[in-house]
Regions:
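Conserved phosphate/metal-binding and DNA-contacting active-site motifs used
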Residues: 1-165
Length: 165
């Protein structure tokens, strides 16, 4: 039996929810294409979560201080953290962290003054940081030790960006 998705109130209160296709195409609750830069294509959580369009949910980042760090392919069997990601996961402050739809990645959500997007590798592993004009798939499947709040990630993001140098 699947656990009910859990999302921080700070995300639930924002009308920036969309649906997504199996291929991660952003969709409106009507089934038409959504856009990460066109707010009229976004919905409330209630509307998006009750829609049967597509295969899941997404949340749009619009530069208002919400940031997501995406660690690609960092989880192995039984959610064992890959060597390349172990130090990163150990540095995560008490914030909302969810397992990605693939089951082998993590989305680290929080607040930050970071603007834009950045993609880089750390010891061969993929790291992405986004705060605007982007949507991320959402599962609500909390990773071990995750909280239900969005913490300040400024220091964490700064530390990650130093790893990218």
């Amino acid at each position: 039996m699947n656990a009910r998705p859990v999302f921080p109130v700070e995300l639930l209160e924002r009308d920036r929810w969309i649906r997504r296709s199996v291929d991660k195409v952003p969709l409106q609750v009507s089934g038409r294409n959504a856009s990460s830069t066109a707010s009229q294509t976004w919905s409330s959580y209630a509307a998006a979560s009750s829609s049967s369009v597509g295969t899941g949910l997404g949340f749009v980042l619009n530069g208002d201080g919400i940031v997501c760090v995406d660690l690609d392919h960092c989880l192995g069997e039984s959610s064992v953290v890959a060597d390349w990601a172990r130090e990163i996961v150990g540095q995560i402050p008490g914030t909302f962290v969810e397992v990605s739809p693939s089951g082998d990645g993590l989305h680290i959500w929080g607040r930050s003054s970071f603007q834009g997007g950045r993609r880089f590798t750390v010891d061969g592993g993929g790291v992405e940081i986004y705060s605007t004009a982007r949507y991320l798939t959402m599962t609500g499947r909390k990773f071990e030790g995750s909280t239900d709040v969005l913490a300040d990630l400024d220091e964490f993001v700064e530390w990650l960006l130093e790893l990218a140098l």
